[in-house]
């Protein structure tokens, strides 16, 4: 399928995974991820892509993580979750940590926030898939952090749910850049359509 047809604004949504202050901002619970984001200048690129998406009617969905202040109900079953629980920065609901970073130009009038409090995927056990289906979305563009865990998990769940998924290769990072490139080449390329932010924005602006 031609990329322009695949990402037609009439049936496409842009999902931005965990680009929130407490993850990719200066005060991060995962400093290595925040550093990778800064080194790649990722937020500026995603801010541009989100602005283009809004301008053509593509819904921007911010997929965030949040927890209760007492962390009740959160996962304890992996090293990743254990490290997050020990961090001085917590993604507590109602705090600045769970808000989308300013670079994304969050627009409360049109953007959507879908939060989760458990798991590794923005799509599993959240409202994301039902909301997309209710709006007749067929294609989901997935960007954000990170290629280590959350982005691949989200892509897999969306593909399993029957959506076409598009992944801009410069729209995500991993804590090891070479590893991120391997995930894109050897895994996500087989289950999604790879492109880049500039090409995607150009298609939307035609």
Please state what every model-predicted region is.
Residues 1-13, 52-56, 81-206:
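Active-site-adjacent betaalpha module
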Residues 15-19:
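N-terminal nucleotide-binding beta1-loop-alpha1 segment
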Residues 20-25:
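Short acidic, Gly/Ser-rich segments with clustered Asp/Glu that frequently serve as metal-coordination loops
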Residues 28, 72-76, 180:
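Short aromatic-enriched loop/helix-cap "lid" or pocket-rim segments at secondary-structure transitions
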Residues 29-38:
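Short glycine-enriched, charge-decorated loop/helix-capping segments at active-site entrances
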Residues 41-59:
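A short, N-terminal amphipathic alpha-helix
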Residues 58-65, 168:
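Short beta-strand segments at enzyme active-site cores
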Residues 71-85:
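Aromatic- and acidic-residue-enriched segments that line the glycan-binding/catalytic groove
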